[in-house]
Swiss-Prot record:
Family: Belongs to the protease inhibitor I39 (alpha-2-macroglobulin) family.
Record GO terms (molecular function): serine-type endopeptidase inhibitor activity
Localization, UniProt: Secreted
InterPro entries according to UniProt: A-macroglobulin_rcpt-bd, A-macroglobulin_rcpt-bd_sf, A2M/Complement_sys, A2M_N_BRD, Alpha-macroglob_thiol-ester_cl, Alpha-macroglobulin_TED, Ig-like_fold, Ig_E-set
Signal peptide: 1-21
One Pfam family this sequence matches: A2M_recep
Main location (coarse class): secreted
Function, as annotated: Is able to inhibit all four classes of proteinases by a unique 'trapping' mechanism.
Official protein name in the record: Ovostatin homolog 1
Native source species: Homo sapiens (Human)
Amino acid sequence: MHVHVCVCLCVCIYTSSCVCACVHMCMRDALLAEGRGGGLAAADDFLYLECCKCFSQESQIAMVCQERSQNETYEVKMNNDTEACRATLNLEERRSVAIRSRENVVFVQTDKPTYKPGQKDVNGIAQFFLDTYTFTYPNITLKDPQNNRIFQRQNVTSFRNITQLSFQLISEPMFGDYWIVVKRNSRETVTHQFAVKRYVLPKFEVTVNAPQTVTISDDEFQVDVCAYNFGQPVQGETQIRVCREYFSSSNCEKNENEICEQFIAQVQTNLDIFTLLCSSFLTVMQISEKTSVFITQLLGTVNFENMDTFYRRGISYFGQLKFSDPNNVPMVNKLLQLELNDEFIGNYTTDENGEAQFSIDTSDIFDPEFNLKVRHQRTEECYLPSWLTPQYLDAHFLVSRFYSRTNSFLKIVPEPKQLECNQQKVVTVHYSLNSEAYEDDSNVKFFYLNGNFSFPISISADLAPAAVLFVYTLHPSGEIVADSVRFQVDKCFKHKVNIKFSNEQGLPGSNASLCLQAAPVLFCALRAVDRNVLLLKSEQQLSAESVSSLYNMVPSIEPYGYFYHGLNLDDGKEDPCIPQRDMFYNGLYYTPVSNYGDGDIYNIVRVRSLRILENIIQTVRTNFPETWMWDLVSVSSSGSANLSFLIPDTITQWEASGFCVNGDVGFGISSTTTLEVSQPFFIEIASPFSVVQNEQFDLIVNVFSYRNTCVEVSYIWECLPGKVNITVVAESKQSSACPNEGMEQQKLNWKDTVVQSFLVEFLFLGDILGLALQNLVVLQMPYGSGEQNAALLASDTYVLDYLKSTEQLTEEVQSKAFFLSILGYQRQLSFKNSDGSYSVFWQQSQKGSIWLSALTFKTLERMKKYVFIDENVQKQTLIWLSSQQKTSGCFKNDGQLFNHALRNALFCLEAALDSGVTNGYNHAILAYAFALAGKEKQVESLLQTLDQSAPKLSKRYYWERERKPKTEEFPSFIPWAPSAQTEKSCYVLLAVISRKIPDLTYASKIVQWLAQRMNSHGGFSSNQVINVGLILIAARGEEGLFSKDQNTVTFSSEGSSEIFQVNGHNRLLVQRSEVTQAPGEYTVDVEGHGCTFIQIFRYTGIRNKSSMVVIDVKMLSGFTPTMSSIEEVNNRSLIFQHKDSYIEYKRADSFPFSVEQSNLVFNIQPAPAMVYDYYEKGRQATAMP
């Protein structure tokens, strides 16, 4: 019987979308069973496979696994049918297989990489895999540089795979890197980083081109400096300085005049002395741009490239040599000498790429390993011992033996270059198969056991970004002979997306057309950003490369064990059936040994992860804004969209790109397209920001023209004595007809304009919170400290609580308060210390304030029902507060509080009461605290004491502070009340209305006095007073203190009158009436239930020192402060910010900073510097230089 045996070669290309499984035996059943105690698969899933059949995961064996959603371990059990295969053996074997569940790919993209304070961060989150249109993210958070969560959205559902969110930054944020963290269902996270800092976009770009390295054999090197304004050359003066940095070698010259030199074309000749005597760095500088040049004695480097770490005996060993200079420039036509185990084997000459190919016949090599060495063949030259001699770097490479029991091998010729998509790649395979297994059978015919063959592969998007080719055969002795190679493929996608502007250039303010081509009926995201923004900070732009990097095609293989997601798939080492003992053969003893450096087929299989099956198809698929486009657009059924956008006025280069996601064809991304916006002819006026009367300055007008033709410029000047109005006009020679009426005239009435130096308004409203609601930011003064910001946050929260309890909270008001609360939360976190406490000012060495930390904790807890608050931040603060508590229950009196009248409130209340309290402010706080605790006896006693000390003025009750300023005996206006006095009265009112049975009559008399102290914004003189005042209003707004009845208010003067209706429907409406004549008499009549308060207040203090003052310095005309000196002032422990600087009282001090003249101004007038007490603004002083 003659049996024809062929060599069966199975070729499998392993990508992220396909896995091949080959069964090399006739069998009856191939059962897939769950390896964790589960039963076998159903009979319908049995496979009937013939010899050497390959199938992919899309076949039946994969269909069994598609119902599994989590990572599982399975066993593949196979046995043969002796009758079908005419065999005499029954074989059964099991192998463990891990099946990876489907995982989506998620990426985050912001509209730009860097933001200024106060800007809005706009980001898009996208994910894709083929058969889904929506996806839900469990959690999306934004973290500041201190790792605080300042924004969070939960269970966010995307629409057609794209989610778009935005977040508003405050005007004074923490500078540094912010992180967007997206949590997926698999509990893995995706992060994206952006920066927040102060910056100014450059008007033009300067580049310095210089070699990275200069060798000691170079007599000169070239430096190119280029300045461009988006393709247009910039005219100006250029200075190039080449400076050799300091080097400690004693051989270097010490002549300081030769350290820095100015060069135009080439380096001066004395540079030869420097390079020969010492190796150092050169720094080439041009304005703010610089580059470094390294001086080296290394003239060239030889490298091995595209080398295999193993050789296979009988198959030639191929490799490549590369020779380049220190700047990685190929060295052409150079002689290289190759050695094997220190024996010369040949000379090779480099080609135009500096490369040379070599091959080694391995038929007679039996060594476990051999060493290759290549060096440059150079002539011998003489040098003095003190000289730096030219050197060339040699290369070494160690090649190990590949083990085969039958001495049979396969070798796939690798491809070092990246393969282009939509092309054919011809793969060549060399093979050498040992014929000894067939020699005992004379009926066997052998064909081509040594040689090579080739076959083509179509490089499609399915193979991107990398594919593994695995080729193997079964030797008759039972050994698997195989090899594999990884091909790098261009980052291409099945989904082709293309965007292009209709014109490459455009004018500011004109329309630009953008053509988008993609798969039909889908959504695409577009982005166009100013190129200058990208120059500020390098970011990983969303591109085909960045998307491809998100894929983990092959899981990592541990050096000890075959682990995948915690599952060990290694079969383990089994004891051999026959022990390894010395063998006696032909009169000699042979000892079995092994070389652990040999490669083998098992390592190839492990690295290619052929035990892992994946049922996932991972196909990779206004007006000077810094971001022009950030939109989601729909593509029609034709697969295209023509869009029109108004070009911003910025003269710059816009970079636009887009990506699309489609459920049928997957993900696609376009290449970047640019639009250059320039003005061929324009003017620019260089003038100071502002000038004062009687000052003079030179008005400089720059005319820019990038036209190829001459442009007529007219200069008209009529010399007249006195003041002259200057008008600069840029116009074209195109004429057009004007309307009959000529230019339309419009009268502008500014809100804050003082008409004829007189402005008086009467305000009418039915709810005391009307003004506070209209001005949720209720202070006119700066509020940069943590103490003031916390009180302001609390105020907004109490306003919302009051409106909610009185059923007046609208969506518009809630949205506004939500926005302000997020900004306030960001600001408050900037005062948080690393231990969880809060300080009044942000300084790294600041000590936490117990009072401020407690207030912040309480405020943020109340804010939880309206905005997101990081629970970890609250826990950290609570732990710190607990550490400050004494065993008696009292707290340490640590930290600082900047309102002197509030400091005594930090003592333990009950201990203070028992020890005898005489301070009226403490009486008020104790009364409120005991009222909240329900201790009526203590409250009654304290209120009686307070009632005796209250001045009862016209049935209006209030409480003065102990050291009050003197007031006029017969004041014309209601006296202005200091912060401590107002706050003390607020606490008494809180105590009254917080009792079990509040005395509303008594409380209304306090409310009338407090209402007279409210400012035009609905607040009081400081944040602390606003906080306490709004607490009582919000807490007991429903108790009937503020009327809901109908009121009619008549405001009249000579010859005119106005009537206002105030009722429950418009109780929050602020109604105004402007006084247009003065002097005059006006009458206000109120009918019904309600009150109207008109107030003007002033104050003159008597204190010798202030708690916290604000310094407001006005700049001289034509001058601006230097940022470096401002930063030095900010770093001092007394300063928080530079525009309105808050100063803690410690001692008399000065705060110098530098200014520079940006515009030339003559007869400069002095600029005032104003200092005022934050809490009592009446204490102020102004100085003139």
